[in-house]
Amino acid sequence: MEIKAEEISEIIRKQIKEYGTEVAVAETGTIISIGDGIARIHGLDKAMAGELLEFPGGITGMVLNLEEDNVGAAILGEFSEIKEGDSVKLTGKIVEVPVGPALIGRVVDAIGNPIDGLGPINTDTFGKVEVKAPGIVKRKSVHQPMQTGLKAIDSMVPIGRGQRELIIGDRQTGKTAVAIDTIINQKGGDVVCIYVAIGQKRSTVAQVVSKLKEHGAMDYTIVVAATASEPAPLQFIAPYTGVTMGEFFRDSGKHALIIYDDLSKQAVAYRQLSLLLRRPPGREAYPGDVFYLHSRLLERACKVSDDCGAGSLTALPVIETQAGDVSAYIPTNVISITDGQIYLESDLFYSGVRPAINVGLSVSRVGGSAQVKAMKQVAGTLRLALAQYREMAAFAQFGSDLDKATQMQLARGARLVEILKQPQYRPIPNEKQVLIIFAANNGFVDEYPIGSLGRYETELYAFFDSRKATLLGELRDKKAIDDAMKGEIIASLEEFKKEFTA
Protein backbone atom coordinates (compact mmCIF):
# COMPACT_ATOMS: atom_id res chain seq x y z
CA MET A 1 0.00 0.00 0.00
CA GLU A 2 1.44 3.35 -1.09
CA ILE A 3 1.34 6.28 1.32
CA LYS A 4 0.83 9.60 -0.44
CA ALA A 5 2.25 12.47 1.58
CA GLU A 6 0.20 15.10 -0.31
CA GLU A 7 -3.08 13.38 0.57
CA ILE A 8 -2.18 13.09 4.24
CA SER A 9 -1.00 16.71 4.47
CA GLU A 10 -4.22 17.83 2.69
CA ILE A 11 -6.38 15.96 5.24
CA ILE A 12 -4.37 17.44 8.15
CA ARG A 13 -4.64 20.95 6.64
CA LYS A 14 -8.42 20.54 6.24
CA GLN A 15 -8.83 19.37 9.84
CA ILE A 16 -6.73 22.27 11.18
CA LYS A 17 -8.89 24.68 9.17
CA GLU A 18 -12.16 23.25 10.56
CA TYR A 19 -10.86 22.90 14.11
CA GLY A 20 -12.72 25.10 16.59
CA THR A 21 -12.31 25.12 20.32
CA GLU A 22 -15.67 25.08 22.06
CA VAL A 23 -15.57 24.94 25.81
CA ALA A 24 -18.90 24.30 27.51
CA VAL A 25 -19.06 26.11 30.84
CA ALA A 26 -21.76 25.05 33.27
CA GLU A 27 -22.15 26.08 36.87
CA THR A 28 -22.45 23.04 39.10
CA GLY A 29 -23.42 22.56 42.71
CA THR A 30 -23.43 19.71 45.22
CA ILE A 31 -26.46 18.09 46.82
CA ILE A 32 -26.26 18.54 50.60
CA SER A 33 -29.58 16.87 51.45
CA ILE A 34 -32.32 15.02 49.55
CA GLY A 35 -35.66 13.44 50.37
CA ASP A 36 -39.39 13.53 49.56
CA GLY A 37 -38.76 15.02 46.12
CA ILE A 38 -36.84 17.99 47.52
CA ALA A 39 -33.09 18.59 47.16
CA ARG A 40 -30.95 21.24 48.84
CA ILE A 41 -27.96 22.20 46.71
CA HIS A 42 -24.87 24.18 47.69
CA GLY A 43 -22.80 26.17 45.20
CA LEU A 44 -25.40 27.33 42.66
CA ASP A 45 -24.86 31.06 43.22
CA LYS A 46 -26.22 32.10 39.81
CA ALA A 47 -29.45 30.03 40.04
CA MET A 48 -32.68 31.84 39.13
CA ALA A 49 -36.14 31.18 40.59
CA GLY A 50 -37.96 28.62 38.46
CA GLU A 51 -34.77 27.62 36.59
CA LEU A 52 -34.38 24.08 35.27
CA LEU A 53 -31.66 21.97 36.90
CA GLU A 54 -30.01 18.82 35.57
CA PHE A 55 -29.54 15.99 38.08
CA PRO A 56 -27.52 12.79 37.45
CA GLY A 57 -29.27 10.23 35.23
CA GLY A 58 -30.99 12.85 33.05
CA ILE A 59 -33.54 13.77 35.75
CA THR A 60 -34.59 17.41 35.86
CA GLY A 61 -35.49 19.68 38.74
CA MET A 62 -36.87 23.15 39.31
CA VAL A 63 -35.47 25.86 41.58
CA LEU A 64 -38.10 26.94 44.14
CA ASN A 65 -36.17 28.43 47.08
CA LEU A 66 -33.18 30.79 46.87
CA GLU A 67 -31.51 30.95 50.28
CA GLU A 68 -28.26 32.46 51.58
CA ASP A 69 -26.11 29.35 51.45
CA ASN A 70 -28.16 26.87 49.41
CA VAL A 71 -30.89 26.40 46.81
CA GLY A 72 -34.08 24.40 47.43
CA ALA A 73 -35.26 22.51 44.35
CA ALA A 74 -38.13 20.19 43.48
CA ILE A 75 -37.13 17.07 41.56
CA LEU A 76 -39.37 16.41 38.56
CA GLY A 77 -39.16 12.65 38.41
CA GLU A 78 -37.99 9.57 40.28
CA PHE A 79 -35.44 10.63 42.92
CA SER A 80 -34.49 7.27 44.48
CA GLU A 81 -31.21 7.05 42.48
CA ILE A 82 -30.05 10.57 43.44
CA LYS A 83 -27.90 10.83 46.58
CA GLU A 84 -26.06 13.38 48.69
CA GLY A 85 -22.79 14.56 47.16
CA ASP A 86 -24.03 14.22 43.56
CA SER A 87 -23.36 17.22 41.34
CA VAL A 88 -26.19 19.28 39.82
CA LYS A 89 -25.90 21.52 36.74
CA LEU A 90 -27.65 24.81 35.97
CA THR A 91 -29.21 24.84 32.49
CA GLY A 92 -30.04 28.54 32.16
CA LYS A 93 -33.53 27.55 30.93
CA ILE A 94 -37.03 27.57 32.39
CA VAL A 95 -39.07 24.33 32.52
CA GLU A 96 -40.51 23.66 29.05
CA VAL A 97 -42.96 21.04 27.80
CA PRO A 98 -43.83 19.84 24.29
CA VAL A 99 -46.91 21.51 22.75
CA GLY A 100 -48.78 21.32 19.46
CA PRO A 101 -51.16 19.09 17.48
CA ALA A 102 -48.81 16.07 17.82
CA LEU A 103 -49.99 15.68 21.43
CA ILE A 104 -53.67 15.21 20.52
CA GLY A 105 -54.83 11.69 21.30
CA ARG A 106 -51.91 11.04 23.65
CA VAL A 107 -51.53 10.43 27.38
CA VAL A 108 -48.50 12.23 28.85
CA ASP A 109 -46.99 12.67 32.31
CA ALA A 110 -46.62 15.94 34.21
CA ILE A 111 -43.67 17.11 32.09
CA GLY A 112 -45.01 15.99 28.71
CA ASN A 113 -43.35 12.57 28.33
CA PRO A 114 -45.63 9.98 26.68
CA ILE A 115 -46.88 7.22 29.01
CA ASP A 116 -49.35 5.50 26.68
CA GLY A 117 -46.87 3.18 24.94
CA LEU A 118 -47.55 4.71 21.50
CA GLY A 119 -43.97 5.83 20.87
CA PRO A 120 -42.36 9.28 21.07
CA ILE A 121 -44.21 12.54 20.37
CA ASN A 122 -42.95 14.17 17.18
CA THR A 123 -42.96 17.89 17.85
CA ASP A 124 -40.32 20.61 17.73
CA THR A 125 -42.53 23.13 19.51
CA PHE A 126 -42.06 23.70 23.22
CA GLY A 127 -43.84 26.04 25.60
CA LYS A 128 -42.67 27.54 28.89
CA VAL A 129 -44.59 26.18 31.86
CA GLU A 130 -44.64 29.51 33.72
CA VAL A 131 -45.67 32.49 31.57
CA LYS A 132 -47.62 35.64 32.32
CA ALA A 133 -51.35 35.56 31.53
CA PRO A 134 -52.51 37.78 28.61
CA GLY A 135 -52.98 41.45 29.55
CA ILE A 136 -56.25 43.39 29.55
CA VAL A 137 -55.79 44.75 26.00
CA LYS A 138 -55.34 41.25 24.55
CA ARG A 139 -58.63 40.01 26.03
CA LYS A 140 -62.22 40.18 24.89
CA SER A 141 -65.40 39.57 26.86
CA VAL A 142 -66.88 36.07 26.67
CA HIS A 143 -69.58 35.91 23.97
CA GLN A 144 -69.51 32.42 22.37
CA PRO A 145 -71.18 29.43 24.05
CA MET A 146 -69.27 26.36 25.25
CA GLN A 147 -71.95 23.66 25.13
CA THR A 148 -71.69 20.95 27.78
CA GLY A 149 -74.56 18.82 26.46
CA LEU A 150 -76.06 18.77 29.97
CA LYS A 151 -79.54 20.29 30.15
CA ALA A 152 -79.21 21.59 33.72
CA ILE A 153 -75.96 23.44 32.90
CA ASP A 154 -76.69 24.76 29.39
CA SER A 155 -80.07 26.09 30.52
CA MET A 156 -79.32 27.58 33.95
CA VAL A 157 -75.53 27.84 34.39
CA PRO A 158 -74.35 28.51 30.81
CA ILE A 159 -70.62 28.46 30.11
CA GLY A 160 -68.92 30.66 27.50
CA ARG A 161 -65.66 30.14 25.61
CA GLY A 162 -62.85 31.68 27.64
CA GLN A 163 -64.70 31.37 30.95
CA ARG A 164 -63.40 29.75 34.16
CA GLU A 165 -66.27 27.78 35.72
CA LEU A 166 -65.62 25.86 38.92
CA ILE A 167 -67.12 22.40 39.48
CA ILE A 168 -67.36 21.96 43.25
CA GLY A 169 -68.82 19.25 45.46
CA ASP A 170 -68.11 16.42 47.88
CA ARG A 171 -66.46 13.18 46.79
CA GLN A 172 -68.63 10.89 44.67
CA THR A 173 -71.10 13.55 43.53
CA GLY A 174 -70.36 13.32 39.81
CA LYS A 175 -67.80 16.14 39.34
CA THR A 176 -65.63 14.17 36.90
CA ALA A 177 -68.78 12.93 35.12
CA VAL A 178 -69.79 16.53 34.31
CA ALA A 179 -66.28 17.24 32.97
CA ILE A 180 -66.10 14.05 30.85
CA ASP A 181 -69.59 14.64 29.40
CA THR A 182 -68.48 18.14 28.40
CA ILE A 183 -65.46 16.66 26.56
CA ILE A 184 -67.65 14.05 24.80
CA ASN A 185 -70.06 16.82 23.74
CA GLN A 186 -67.28 18.60 21.80
CA LYS A 187 -67.19 15.74 19.26
CA GLY A 188 -67.45 17.02 15.69
CA GLY A 189 -66.72 20.57 16.87
CA ASP A 190 -63.62 22.79 16.79
CA VAL A 191 -62.54 22.50 20.44
CA VAL A 192 -59.35 20.73 21.56
CA CYS A 193 -59.79 19.27 25.07
CA ILE A 194 -57.13 18.76 27.73
CA TYR A 195 -57.87 16.63 30.78
CA VAL A 196 -55.38 17.05 33.65
CA ALA A 197 -55.62 14.30 36.29
CA ILE A 198 -53.95 15.34 39.56
CA GLY A 199 -53.42 12.88 42.40
CA GLN A 200 -55.95 10.35 41.12
CA LYS A 201 -55.65 6.58 41.14
CA ARG A 202 -54.09 5.13 37.99
CA SER A 203 -57.09 2.85 37.55
CA THR A 204 -59.39 5.91 37.52
CA VAL A 205 -57.29 7.66 34.86
CA ALA A 206 -57.20 4.46 32.77
CA GLN A 207 -60.99 4.24 33.06
CA VAL A 208 -61.41 7.88 31.92
CA VAL A 209 -59.10 7.31 28.92
CA SER A 210 -60.97 4.14 27.89
CA LYS A 211 -64.34 5.98 28.15
CA LEU A 212 -62.99 8.82 26.01
CA LYS A 213 -61.72 6.29 23.44
CA GLU A 214 -65.06 4.46 23.48
CA HIS A 215 -66.90 7.68 22.58
CA GLY A 216 -64.31 8.76 19.98
CA ALA A 217 -63.25 11.71 22.13
CA MET A 218 -59.51 10.91 22.24
CA ASP A 219 -59.34 12.18 18.62
CA TYR A 220 -59.35 15.74 19.98
CA THR A 221 -58.17 15.25 23.58
CA ILE A 222 -54.83 15.34 25.42
CA VAL A 223 -54.61 13.64 28.83
CA VAL A 224 -51.98 14.87 31.31
CA ALA A 225 -51.67 12.48 34.25
CA ALA A 226 -49.87 13.04 37.56
CA THR A 227 -51.30 10.14 39.53
CA ALA A 228 -51.36 9.60 43.31
CA SER A 229 -48.13 7.56 43.18
CA GLU A 230 -46.16 10.40 41.55
CA PRO A 231 -43.97 12.66 43.73
CA ALA A 232 -45.54 15.93 44.96
CA PRO A 233 -43.51 18.16 42.57
CA LEU A 234 -45.10 16.44 39.56
CA GLN A 235 -48.62 16.82 41.00
CA PHE A 236 -47.84 20.50 41.59
CA ILE A 237 -46.59 21.17 38.06
CA ALA A 238 -49.12 19.07 36.05
CA PRO A 239 -51.82 21.80 35.77
CA TYR A 240 -49.23 24.28 34.44
CA THR A 241 -48.13 21.71 31.86
CA GLY A 242 -51.75 21.27 30.77
CA VAL A 243 -52.45 24.99 30.49
CA THR A 244 -49.23 25.48 28.46
CA MET A 245 -50.51 22.91 25.95
CA GLY A 246 -53.89 24.68 25.88
CA GLU A 247 -52.29 28.09 25.36
CA PHE A 248 -50.67 26.87 22.15
CA PHE A 249 -54.14 26.34 20.65
CA ARG A 250 -55.53 29.55 22.19
CA ASP A 251 -52.70 31.60 20.68
CA SER A 252 -53.10 29.87 17.29
CA GLY A 253 -56.65 31.26 17.03
CA LYS A 254 -58.25 27.93 17.97
CA HIS A 255 -60.52 27.00 20.88
CA ALA A 256 -59.45 24.77 23.76
CA LEU A 257 -61.07 23.41 26.92
CA ILE A 258 -59.02 22.38 29.94
CA ILE A 259 -60.21 20.40 32.96
CA TYR A 260 -58.16 20.30 36.18
CA ASP A 261 -59.29 17.26 38.16
CA ASP A 262 -58.75 18.35 40.85
CA LEU A 263 -57.06 21.47 42.24
CA SER A 264 -57.60 20.44 45.90
CA LYS A 265 -55.00 17.72 45.39
CA GLN A 266 -52.63 20.16 43.69
CA ALA A 267 -52.94 22.49 46.71
CA VAL A 268 -52.15 19.56 49.04
CA ALA A 269 -49.07 18.67 46.93
CA TYR A 270 -47.95 22.32 47.00
CA ARG A 271 -48.48 22.44 50.79
CA GLN A 272 -46.26 19.36 51.13
CA LEU A 273 -43.55 20.95 48.95
CA SER A 274 -43.70 24.25 50.84
CA LEU A 275 -43.48 22.63 54.27
CA LEU A 276 -40.52 20.50 53.14
CA LEU A 277 -38.86 23.67 51.84
CA ARG A 278 -39.47 25.14 55.33
CA ARG A 279 -41.67 27.97 54.10
CA PRO A 280 -43.84 29.40 56.92
CA PRO A 281 -47.31 27.77 57.05
CA GLY A 282 -50.52 29.83 57.12
CA ARG A 283 -54.22 28.95 57.36
CA GLU A 284 -54.85 25.16 57.33
CA ALA A 285 -51.01 24.83 57.07
CA TYR A 286 -51.11 26.02 53.43
CA PRO A 287 -48.36 28.49 52.47
CA GLY A 288 -49.18 32.18 52.10
CA ASP A 289 -49.02 32.11 48.30
CA VAL A 290 -51.52 29.26 47.72
CA PHE A 291 -54.01 31.84 46.35
CA TYR A 292 -51.40 32.93 43.79
CA LEU A 293 -50.76 29.26 42.93
CA HIS A 294 -54.33 28.99 41.57
CA SER A 295 -54.87 32.57 40.38
CA ARG A 296 -51.86 32.59 38.06
CA LEU A 297 -53.00 29.24 36.65
CA LEU A 298 -56.64 30.18 36.05
CA GLU A 299 -55.89 33.68 34.71
CA ARG A 300 -54.24 32.00 31.71
CA ALA A 301 -57.67 30.82 30.53
CA CYS A 302 -59.39 33.62 28.62
CA LYS A 303 -61.02 34.77 25.39
CA VAL A 304 -58.41 36.48 23.20
CA SER A 305 -59.27 39.63 21.21
CA ASP A 306 -59.76 39.52 17.42
CA ASP A 307 -56.44 41.33 16.84
CA CYS A 308 -54.61 38.52 18.66
CA GLY A 309 -56.28 35.64 16.79
CA ALA A 310 -59.70 35.39 18.52
CA GLY A 311 -58.81 32.04 20.15
CA SER A 312 -60.04 30.95 23.56
CA LEU A 313 -59.11 28.70 26.46
CA THR A 314 -61.96 27.64 28.75
CA ALA A 315 -61.10 26.19 32.17
CA LEU A 316 -63.23 23.86 34.28
CA PRO A 317 -61.34 23.45 37.56
CA VAL A 318 -62.66 20.84 40.00
CA ILE A 319 -62.56 21.28 43.79
CA GLU A 320 -63.49 18.59 46.29
CA THR A 321 -65.18 19.79 49.47
CA GLN A 322 -65.30 17.98 52.83
CA ALA A 323 -68.88 17.37 54.02
CA GLY A 324 -70.20 20.22 51.87
CA ASP A 325 -68.00 22.88 53.51
CA VAL A 326 -67.71 25.53 50.78
CA SER A 327 -66.24 28.04 53.25
CA ALA A 328 -62.93 26.19 53.67
CA TYR A 329 -59.72 27.90 52.53
CA ILE A 330 -59.11 26.41 49.07
CA PRO A 331 -62.80 26.34 47.96
CA THR A 332 -63.30 30.04 48.86
CA ASN A 333 -60.05 30.96 47.09
CA VAL A 334 -61.01 29.23 43.85
CA ILE A 335 -64.63 30.47 43.99
CA SER A 336 -63.30 34.04 44.15
CA ILE A 337 -60.93 33.48 41.21
CA THR A 338 -63.42 31.80 38.85
CA ASP A 339 -66.37 33.28 36.90
CA GLY A 340 -68.96 31.14 38.65
CA GLN A 341 -69.44 27.65 40.05
CA ILE A 342 -71.47 24.51 39.50
CA TYR A 343 -72.27 23.18 42.97
CA LEU A 344 -72.97 19.45 43.17
CA GLU A 345 -74.75 18.17 46.26
CA SER A 346 -74.53 14.66 47.70
CA ASP A 347 -78.15 14.75 49.00
CA LEU A 348 -79.43 15.42 45.49
CA PHE A 349 -77.10 12.77 44.07
CA TYR A 350 -78.37 10.08 46.45
CA SER A 351 -82.00 11.07 45.87
CA GLY A 352 -81.52 10.27 42.17
CA VAL A 353 -81.19 13.80 40.76
CA ARG A 354 -78.20 13.42 38.44
CA PRO A 355 -76.34 15.59 37.51
CA ALA A 356 -76.78 16.64 41.16
CA ILE A 357 -76.65 20.39 40.54
CA ASN A 358 -77.89 22.67 43.31
CA VAL A 359 -79.45 25.42 41.18
CA GLY A 360 -79.66 27.87 44.09
CA LEU A 361 -75.91 27.83 44.81
CA SER A 362 -74.70 27.43 41.21
CA VAL A 363 -74.08 30.53 39.14
CA SER A 364 -72.38 31.61 35.92
CA ARG A 365 -71.20 35.22 36.13
CA VAL A 366 -70.34 35.76 32.47
CA GLY A 367 -71.96 32.85 30.61
CA GLY A 368 -75.36 34.54 30.24
CA SER A 369 -74.05 36.75 27.44
CA ALA A 370 -72.76 33.66 25.63
CA GLN A 371 -75.95 31.60 25.94
CA VAL A 372 -77.78 30.62 22.74
CA LYS A 373 -80.80 32.92 22.30
CA ALA A 374 -83.27 30.04 21.87
CA MET A 375 -82.15 28.56 25.19
CA LYS A 376 -82.39 31.97 26.87
CA GLN A 377 -85.97 32.27 25.59
CA VAL A 378 -87.14 28.90 26.96
CA ALA A 379 -85.02 28.69 30.12
CA GLY A 380 -85.43 32.27 31.34
CA THR A 381 -87.98 31.34 34.01
CA LEU A 382 -86.58 27.87 34.76
CA ARG A 383 -84.30 28.85 37.66
CA LEU A 384 -87.09 30.84 39.35
CA ALA A 385 -89.65 28.05 38.84
CA LEU A 386 -87.30 25.49 40.41
CA ALA A 387 -86.47 27.78 43.34
CA GLN A 388 -90.20 28.33 44.01
CA TYR A 389 -90.83 24.59 43.72
CA ARG A 390 -88.11 23.79 46.30
CA GLU A 391 -89.56 26.34 48.70
CA MET A 392 -93.11 25.05 48.26
CA ALA A 393 -92.05 21.41 48.53
CA ALA A 394 -90.44 22.21 51.89
CA PHE A 395 -93.70 23.81 53.15
CA ALA A 396 -95.91 21.11 51.62
CA GLN A 397 -94.33 18.55 53.96
CA PHE A 398 -96.14 20.22 56.88
CA GLY A 399 -99.60 20.79 55.36
CA SER A 400 -101.79 18.24 53.59
CA ASP A 401 -104.65 20.38 52.24
CA LEU A 402 -103.09 22.49 49.48
CA ASP A 403 -105.01 24.72 47.09
CA LYS A 404 -105.23 23.87 43.37
CA ALA A 405 -102.64 26.46 42.25
CA THR A 406 -100.05 25.15 44.75
CA GLN A 407 -100.69 21.54 43.72
CA MET A 408 -100.19 22.50 40.05
CA GLN A 409 -96.98 24.35 40.85
CA LEU A 410 -95.65 21.37 42.81
CA ALA A 411 -96.56 18.98 39.97
CA ARG A 412 -94.88 21.25 37.37
CA GLY A 413 -91.76 21.63 39.55
CA ALA A 414 -91.42 17.87 40.07
CA ARG A 415 -91.64 17.38 36.29
CA LEU A 416 -89.02 20.08 35.63
CA VAL A 417 -86.64 18.34 38.06
CA GLU A 418 -87.30 15.03 36.27
CA ILE A 419 -86.77 16.58 32.81
CA LEU A 420 -83.36 17.97 33.87
CA LYS A 421 -82.08 14.52 34.90
CA GLN A 422 -79.69 12.96 32.43
CA PRO A 423 -77.74 9.69 32.20
CA GLN A 424 -73.94 9.80 32.10
CA TYR A 425 -72.03 9.83 28.76
CA ARG A 426 -75.16 10.98 26.91
CA PRO A 427 -74.81 14.68 26.13
CA ILE A 428 -77.77 16.20 24.24
CA PRO A 429 -77.48 18.71 21.35
CA ASN A 430 -78.65 22.22 22.19
CA GLU A 431 -81.69 22.24 19.87
CA LYS A 432 -83.08 19.08 21.52
CA GLN A 433 -82.52 20.54 24.98
CA VAL A 434 -84.54 23.59 23.91
CA LEU A 435 -87.38 21.30 22.72
CA ILE A 436 -87.77 19.33 25.93
CA ILE A 437 -87.54 22.43 28.18
CA PHE A 438 -90.07 24.21 25.92
CA ALA A 439 -92.41 21.21 26.24
CA ALA A 440 -92.06 21.15 30.06
CA ASN A 441 -92.53 24.92 30.43
CA ASN A 442 -95.64 24.95 28.26
CA GLY A 443 -97.43 22.20 30.16
CA PHE A 444 -97.05 19.41 27.58
CA VAL A 445 -95.75 16.96 30.21
CA ASP A 446 -98.06 17.92 33.10
CA GLU A 447 -100.55 15.12 32.48
CA TYR A 448 -97.99 12.28 32.37
CA PRO A 449 -96.74 10.44 35.46
CA ILE A 450 -93.17 11.34 36.45
CA GLY A 451 -91.95 7.78 35.80
CA SER A 452 -92.80 7.97 32.09
CA LEU A 453 -91.00 11.27 31.36
CA GLY A 454 -87.69 9.56 30.49
CA ARG A 455 -89.48 7.60 27.77
CA TYR A 456 -91.38 10.75 26.70
CA GLU A 457 -88.07 12.56 26.15
CA THR A 458 -86.46 9.69 24.18
CA GLU A 459 -89.52 9.26 21.95
CA LEU A 460 -89.85 13.04 21.45
CA TYR A 461 -86.27 13.22 20.11
CA ALA A 462 -86.89 10.23 17.83
CA PHE A 463 -90.15 11.84 16.57
CA PHE A 464 -88.42 15.13 15.71
CA ASP A 465 -85.42 13.33 14.15
CA SER A 466 -87.59 11.26 11.82
CA ARG A 467 -90.60 13.50 11.12
CA LYS A 468 -89.60 17.09 11.94
CA ALA A 469 -85.94 17.11 10.90
CA THR A 470 -86.38 20.40 8.97
CA LEU A 471 -87.75 22.20 12.03
CA LEU A 472 -84.94 20.77 14.17
CA GLY A 473 -82.35 21.92 11.61
CA GLU A 474 -83.93 25.38 11.48
CA LEU A 475 -83.77 25.64 15.28
CA ARG A 476 -80.11 24.54 15.20
CA ASP A 477 -79.14 27.10 12.55
CA LYS A 478 -81.23 30.09 13.64
CA LYS A 479 -80.44 29.60 17.36
CA ALA A 480 -83.57 31.64 18.18
CA ILE A 481 -87.34 31.03 18.29
CA ASP A 482 -89.55 33.52 16.41
CA ASP A 483 -93.36 33.51 16.50
CA ALA A 484 -93.68 31.34 13.38
CA MET A 485 -91.26 28.73 14.74
CA LYS A 486 -92.98 28.80 18.13
CA GLY A 487 -96.28 27.96 16.41
CA GLU A 488 -94.61 25.11 14.49
CA ILE A 489 -93.06 23.67 17.66
CA ILE A 490 -96.39 23.80 19.52
CA ALA A 491 -98.17 22.12 16.58
CA SER A 492 -95.48 19.40 16.44
CA LEU A 493 -95.72 18.81 20.21
CA GLU A 494 -99.53 18.53 19.91
CA GLU A 495 -99.05 16.00 17.11
CA PHE A 496 -96.61 13.99 19.24
CA LYS A 497 -99.01 14.18 22.21
CA LYS A 498 -101.65 12.26 20.24
CA GLU A 499 -99.19 9.43 19.53
CA PHE A 500 -97.51 9.15 22.93
CA THR A 501 -99.09 6.90 25.52
CA ALA A 502 -97.76 7.09 29.07
Curated annotation (Swiss-Prot):
Provenance organism: Geobacter sp. (strain M21)
Residue positions binding ATP: G169, D170, R171, Q172, T173, G174, K175, T176
SUPFAM superfamilies: C-terminal domain of alpha and beta subunits of F1 ATP synthase, N-terminal domain of alpha and beta subunits of F1 ATP synthase, P-loop containing nucleoside triphosphate hydrolases
Major subcellular site: membrane
Signal sequence region: none
Subunit structure: F-type ATPases have 2 components, CF(1) - the catalytic core - and CF(0) - the membrane proton channel. CF(1) has five subunits: alpha(3), beta(3), gamma(1), delta(1), epsilon(1). CF(0) has three main subunits: a(1), b(2) and c(9-12). The alpha and beta chains form an alternating ring which encloses part of the gamma chain. CF(1) is attached to CF(0) by a central stalk formed by the gamma and epsilon chains, while a peripheral stalk is formed by the delta and b chains.
GO cellular component, as recorded: plasma membrane; proton-transporting ATP synthase complex
Catalytic reaction list: ATP + H2O + 4 H(+)(in) = ADP + phosphate + 5 H(+)(out)
Reported function: Produces ATP from ADP in the presence of a proton gradient across the membrane. The alpha chain is a regulatory subunit.
Pfam families: ATP-synt_ab, ATP-synt_ab_C, ATP-synt_ab_N
Membrane topology qualifier: Peripheral membrane protein
The entry's keywords: ATP synthesis, ATP-binding, Cell inner membrane, Cell membrane, CF(1), Hydrogen ion transport, Ion transport, Membrane, Nucleotide-binding, Translocase, Transport
Domain of life (superkingdom): Bacteria
Name assigned to this protein: ATP synthase subunit alpha
InterPro entries documented for this protein: ATP_synth_asu-like_sf, ATP_synth_asu_C, ATP_synth_asu_C_sf, ATP_synth_F1_a_nt-bd_dom, ATP_synth_F1_asu, ATPase_a/bsu_AS, ATPase_F1/V1/A1_a/bsu_N, ATPase_F1/V1/A1_a/bsu_N_sf
Lineage, opening ranks: Bacteria, Pseudomonadati, Thermodesulfobacteriota, Desulfuromonadia, Geobacterales
